[in-house]
Regions:
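Positively charged n-region of N-terminal signal peptides that target proteins for export
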Residues: 1-4
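Hydrophobic h-region of N-terminal signal peptides that target proteins for export
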Residues: 6-18
Length: 594
């Protein structure tokens, strides 16, 4: 196979990345060049086309150094999320007079770092931290990573900065807290994490962040929405894939929530009518021109642009993307067998019988007799409108949030909640904006409110947790970008379907070939690309198939900038194995029709 090619290309390589990062963050002079410290309280998940800030107390998707938006998509371009968080709420029957309680994170953080060691006793938060690993930490080019987590311009990154980030990856790999619940591959099967044998992480991810939080700090919970602590521990795992397909446009977020209780909680304590929600304040480029939407069948809530050009993306020559959240795995609830009269069937001892034909995903496996709840409500509101954010620091905020969790307007009368109304049908609904903007069908944003600063809430429930119970929620933060704002919505939904299928199949999807090791020679109006010189690289790229797929050849693309997506590129050449295979079939989005 010919692997040497002479191309006539515009000299744009790597320039865009440098310019995109140059003006951000604090000057390099503020960092000690010879003693660079990489924070273990805050970091980024940034292995693919999306980058997101996270902090060890649960603060999420907001830059903790600047206070600005904290999710960038596509990576190294503009921001899409100002802040997000997970909210939980339910009727807590643990002996305390205050039953209705809500916790989690929005603009205030109702959680603190650390595990719950026993009822009402939390780990010293000063000993808890974030852990971040990536599989290629020893050999990867970490300059852009260092630029992002240290908040400095790319051209300001020194060898000391890069090696400090590399050293932190190594430390986190060696100190991975498996004993606290952090996931790992137990290669020797002894149940203990040994970094010389085992590997931290899950789901074949290329980058993983793990930390644990709890809600036992009453000062934090009351500052949020006036509630008392519940006694919940949440083990949080974020992960991503260094891929160029749909998995490269996603950040996965898993919340493993354990009800461990407050010090006063009775042994028979239970949380009834409990809900989880993904809350988000999206700012897609310019926050003043945003629309929101939902796809109920996909359990997807999202934000997109109301106009064709967004000031945040025009400098990059990009149409505005669409970004959303999907409950890939909701909380589990039992599914019971029914008798001939439609009642729950029982055995001879009076025990209710589970229907084991129903299967839920739980703990990276399958659990017969249960089902995962989907998104059970999607609501939105606009900053400054009649329906706005629940009140921080006051118990009325708890009441408002509990109505939101159940799909009602954020008012404080829990017994008499006010529903949302579809303005096209005048029917009450728990799923606002559930039309299809790409096809102009159903209720889409712009009615009754004009474009502006949006909040979105995806809720799932109800379910019950007894003391000692564990529930899991897995949320995907996804992006889609195409040639215009509405095609970006279609691309987002296509990505979501791919990601849900991959998740349901435990990520048994074909991996793309390893990128070849390319040598570049620049001549007068000519660039020579040579990827036939490194035998090990050739073997890594061509020698191993994946999930039934075998290597067939190379496509070479020219892109307008380093930030551009493959859809913006022009295919320059194909170098194909001469084996009679002329067509490779696959599922792809028709970007013209959506």
């Amino acid at each position: 196979m010919k692997k040497l090619v002479v191309l006539f290309l515009a000299a744009l390589f790597l320039v865009g990345n440098v310019q995109a990062r140059e003006e951000r963050g604090t000057p390099a002079a503020k960092l000690a060049q010879d003693d660079v410290e990489v924070s273990t309280e805050r970091t980024q998940l940034n292995i693919n086309n999306m980058a997101m800030w996270i902090q060890s107390d649960g603060w999420s998707a907001r830059d903790p150094l600047t206070g600005n938006s904290g999710v960038t998509y596509p990576r190294s371009t503009s921001q899409v999320i100002f802040q997000d968080g997970i909210i939980w709420g339910g009727r807590v029957k643990d002996g305390n007079d205050q039953e209705l309680r809500v916790g989690g994170q929005t603009y205030e953080i109702g959680t603190v770092p650390g595990i719950i060691e026993s009822k009402g006793i939390a780990q010293d938060r000063d000993t808890a931290r974030l852990y971040r690993i990536r599989r290629d930490w020893a050999t990867a080019d970490l300059r852009l990573d260092a630029s992002e987590v240290l908040n400095i311009g790319l051209s300001q990154v020194t060898d000391a900065h890069e090696e400090a980030v590399r050293a932190q990856y190594e430390r986190d790999w060696m100190e991975w807290p498996a004993e606290l619940g952090a996931p790992f591959y137990d290669n020797d099967g002894d149940g203990q994490y040994d970094p010389s044998v085992d590997e931290p992480g899950l789901a074949n991810a290329d980058q993983v962040i793990w930390f644990v939080i709890n809600d036992l700090d009453q000062g934090a919970t009351t500052t949020l929405y006036g509630s008392l602590p519940i006694g919940l521990e949440a083990q949080v795992t974020l992960w991503g894939y260094a891929r160029t397909d749909a998995l490269g446009d996603v950040i996965f977020k898993k919340f493993k929530v354990i009800y461990k209780g407050t010090a006063e909680a009775a042994d028979d304590a239970v949380i009834e009518d409990m809900y989880f929600a993904q809350w988000s304040d999206p700012d897609l480029g310019d926050y003043g021109d945003d629309f929101a939407g939902a796809d109920v069948d996909l359990s997807l809530g999202y934000v997109y642009n109301s106009i064709d050009a967004d000031p945040g993306y025009v400098p990059f020559g990009l149409a505005p993307p669409a970004v959303g959240y999907d409950f890939l795995q909701g909380p589990i609830v039992p599914v019971y067998q029914l008798d001939a009269e439609g009642n729950i069937a029982v055995d001879e001892d009076g025990n209710q019988l589970l229907d084991e034909s129903s299967v839920a995903i739980f703990n990276e496996g399958l659990r017969p007799g249960y089902q995962n709840l989907p998104m059970t409500a999607f609501v939105y509101f606009a900053a400054g409108s009649a329906i706005s954010d629940p009140e921080l620091g006051e118990y009325v905020g708890t009441q408002q949030w509990y109505n939101l969790l159940r799909g009602f307007q954020p008012q404080d009368d829990v017994a008499n909640p006010v529903p949302y109304t579809n303005p096209l049908t005048n029917a009450d609904t728990k799923f606002t904006l559930d039309g299809d903007p790409a096809r102009a069908t159903g209720w889409n944003d712009g009615v009754p409110l004009p474009a502006g600063d949006r909040r979105i809430v995806l809720a799932t429930g109800p379910f019950e947790m007894a003391l000692g119970d564990t529930q899991e929620v897995v949320v995907a933060l996804l992006g889609g970008i195409s040639t215009d704002r509405l095609r970006s919505v279609s691309k987002l939904k296509f990505t979501d379907q791919f990601v849900q299928d991959a998740y349901n199949g435990f990520f048994q999807v074909p991996k793309p070939p390893v990128q070849p090791n390319v040598r570049i020679v620049e001549l007068d109006e000519t660039i020579i690309l040579d990827w036939g010189w490194d035998d090990d690289s050739i073997q890594a790229t061509e020698g191993e198939g994946s999930a039934g797929f075998e290597f067939e050849g190379y496509n070479l693309y020219q892109l307008p900038s380093a930030e551009a997506t493959l859809s913006q590129g022009v295919k320059v050449a194909t170098f194909d194995i001469e084996n009679g295979v002329t067509t490779i079939l696959g599922i792809a989005l028709d970007e013209e029709s959506g």
